[in-house]
Amino acid sequence: MSVLQVLHYPDERLRKIAAPVKEVNGEIQRIVDDMFETMYAEEGIGLAATQVDVHLQIIVIDVSENRDQRLVLINPELLEKSGETGIEEGCLSIPEQRALVPRAEKVKIRALDRDGKPFELEADDLLAICIQHEMDHLVGKLFVDYLSPLKRQRIRQKLEKMAKLNARAN
C-alpha cells in the first residue's frame, strides 16, 4: 500500500466528475487500499477517489474512534434522505479550513463493497454527513460551494498564502 498525494483546492481536478467503476478487480482493490492508507496518514475520516486524482466512483470512510470500521462505497447511489443537520466540516483537500454545511440527518444508500458485492446502508449523524460530503466530491462539488462567495474567496486566499509559505519553507 502507498500514500497518495491529496489534491488541494482550488485545483481544477477536484471539479472532475467521477466515472462509475465498470468492474471491481485487483486494480480497484489496490486503489481502495491506497486510499485507506492515505486517509489514515492524513488523519481524515473519509476520502473520495477524486481527491487523489483518480476519477472513479470510489469512497473510503472510517468514522470510528479506533479506526477499525472501514467502509468502502463503490458506485454509491443516494436512495433516500431525511431531516436536517449540519456540523463544521473539514476536508483533506481544503486543509485547516472548516465551515458549517447543511446536510440531511439520515441517508440510505446503495453501493458495491470492496469485493464488488451490492449492499444498502442506512446512516445517520456523522456517518451520514461524511457519506454526503464524499459523494459530493464524486460530482466535483466541495463544501466551500455551499458557502457565500465572500467566505469562499477568504478560504481560497488563506490556502494560497499557506501554499506560498510552504513553497518557501521547502
Swiss-Prot record:
It catalyses: N-terminal N-formyl-L-methionyl-[peptide] + H2O = N-terminal L-methionyl-[peptide] + formate. Transmembrane segments: none annotated. InterPro entries: Peptide_deformylase, Peptide_deformylase_sf. It is an enzyme of class 3 (hydrolase). Its cofactor is Fe(2+). Its EC number is 3.5.1.88. One of its GO terms (molecular function) is metal ion binding. The active site is at residue 134. Binds 1 Fe(2+) ion. CDD domains: Pep_deformylase (cd00487). Fe cation binds at residues 91, 133, 137. Keywords: Hydrolase, Iron, Metal-binding, Protein biosynthesis. GO terms for biological process: co-translational protein modification; translation. SUPFAM superfamilies: Peptide deformylase. The keyword Repeat does not apply. Pfam families: Pep_deformylase. Removes the formyl group from the N-terminal Met of newly synthesized proteins. Requires at least a dipeptide for an efficient rate of reaction. N-terminal L-methionine is a prerequisite for activity but the enzyme has broad specificity at other positions. Belongs to the polypeptide deformylase family. HAMAP family: Pep_deformylase. This is Peptide deformylase. It comes from Yersinia enterocolitica serotype O:8 / biotype 1B (strain NCTC 13174 / 8081).
